[in-house]
Amino acid sequence: MRAVVLDADGLPELADLPEPSGAGLLVRVLACGLCGSDVEKLGHAARGTVLGHEIAGVLENGARVTVMHRVSCGTCERCLAGHQSTCGEFRELRIAPGGFAEQLRATHCVPLPDTLEELDGVWVEPLACVLRAAASVPRGRVLVVGAGAIGQLWIQVLRRRGDDVVALDPRPERLATAHLLGAETADVDTVAVAVLTAPGGINAALRRLEPGGTLLVFAAPEEDVPTTLDAVYRKELHVVGSRSATPAYFREAVELLPTLVLPEVTTLPLDRFLEGVELYRRGEALKVVFTP
């Protein structure tokens, strides 16, 4: 089968791999979304790695599914405290290989309803992550930093729970979409919560947070952005990190997904993987999805 495999330098190349064997159900991949975390791993991950975890697929019996690529134990001290993504078992991948392949094996599959379009399963994992993270921050006036694909999911989730949402993004076309989804796009002085959905923007968030406010880090901040913790100290801010999701949030995402306005997708075949990565890096594609 074909797959996008990282070479000795951590760079992607299209290669032929044996059909996956071992534990789990055999899944034929219909589509796999490109996540920012995938792009971050390029040039760094080990040789032979196949990335991709935002997956829409179909089982041998014809059932459509998405998959959970990491699962916590659910019983350890960290899991019981609500920090499932820091569980020791969470580090183990539950799919082999990754989603940028024609097939994979997965130990944890989540059924998808027929009401979803065939490729919409790629949105379940990111939406589940948004739902879990949103549950960890208080309600109020929320600044969403970044109105890209993930930011647009955030806006809709927050508006549905009754929050006033302000969107911040340098691209006018993305702000226009954010406005249509119910967010304010005029700049504001203070907010109760700031959600960082893309690298960069942390200083803009810290400036706008009111005393006692909450900063939710939902994307890895850029390493070269100079940031001071002075605002955290002086305004007594709360800083929360959140990544990944639990089975309960996957199920909730499956139910919620058909009611959302999904971001625009650029669909490419696997043999145009590098092109898709560059479109993502330049901000020319809101969401890149690859099909085998």
Placement of each model-derived feature along the sequence:
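C-terminal hydrophobic helical "lid"/dimerization subdomain
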Residues: P247-P292
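Mid-domain Rossmann-like dinucleotide-binding core that forms the NAD(H)/NADP(H) cofactor-binding site
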Residues: L116-D187
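Residues in the short beta-alpha loop(s) of Rossmann-like NAD(P)-binding domains
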Residues: R171, P221, A245
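Rossmann-fold dehydrogenase core element
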Residues: T214, P226-P263
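Glycine-rich beta-strand-centered segment in the early N-terminal region that forms part
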Residues: P20-C32, L42-L80, V110-T115
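NAD(P)H dinucleotide-binding glycine-rich loop of Rossmann-like/cofactor-binding domains
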Residues: V71-V145
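N-terminal glycine-rich cofactor-binding segment
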Residues: A3-P20, G33-V58, A81-P97
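Glycine-rich cofactor phosphate-binding loops and adjacent beta1-alpha1 units
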Residues: A176-E236
